[in-house]
Amino acid sequence: MRKWILTWILPSLLYRSCFHIICLVGTISLACNDMTPEQMATNVNCSSPERHTRSYDYMEGGDIRVRRLFCRTQWYLRIDKRGKVKGTQEMKNNYNIMEIRTVAVGIVAIKGVESEYYLAMNKEGKLYAKKECNEDCNFKELILENHYNTYASAKWTHSGGEMFVALNSKGVPVRGKKTKKEQKTAHFLPMAIT
């Protein structure tokens, strides 16, 4: 009878120990996912290929993508031949075709292909266009969980907060001072040219 009891206790103990090991490993992986990139770089145990799946090649420098930037407010970003920045709902408009050039990791410059003007933002958060690219033309490109991108000025901030490229529901550019990353006016889909 005792032998019978021991054979049932042994698998139970094995299952419990396996369960505790699984919980421990799960806790460690959760702790690693909450780390900043700097902490992850120093912690070898948490570094894994799965953690870096959102590392896109074009963010590492030198790449050029030709896209239409479609805002969640249903407008395409447009830079016309006079350098005016606004939205258009015409998909086949050549002035809404943009060249997105990677300047540094996560930093891009956006240029209208037809107009040959660069998108820029001044310290007041106003969007404008320039023929020559400078620091006002650099934007931090961030890919959100909802698959939209945001473009924040790499040079200018307002009260410590980032200023984003944004189009309101009428296609008018919103001043960067009035924008936040969570607002749909600042969310853009880079659409491939067909």
From Swiss-Prot:
Q: What does this protein do?
A: Plays an important role in the regulation of embryonic development, cell proliferation and cell differentiation. Required for normal branching morphogenesis. Growth factor active on keratinocytes. Possible major paracrine effector of normal epithelial cell proliferation.
Instruction: Give yes or no: UniProt keyword Signal.
Output: yes
Give the domain of life.
Eukaryota
Protein name listed in UniProt: Fibroblast growth factor 7
- Transmembrane annotation, as ranges: none
A GO molecular function assigned to this protein is: heparin binding
List UniProt keywords, sorted A-Z.
Glycoprotein, Growth factor, Heparin-binding, Mitogen, Signal
How the protein assembles, per its UniProt entry? Interacts with FGFBP1. Interacts with FGFR2. Affinity between fibroblast growth factors (FGFs) and their receptors is increased by heparan sulfate glycosaminoglycans that function as coreceptors.
State the SUPFAM superfamilies in the record: Cytokine
The record's similarity note reads: Belongs to the heparin-binding growth factors family.
> Which species?
Ovis aries (Sheep)
* InterPro entries assigned: Fibroblast_GF_fam (IPR002209), IL1/FGF (IPR008996)
GO BP terms? positive regulation of cell division
Q: Which residues are glycosylated?
A: N45
The record's listing under Pfam families reads: FGF
Q: May I ask which residue range the UniProt record assigns to the signal sequence?
A: 1-31
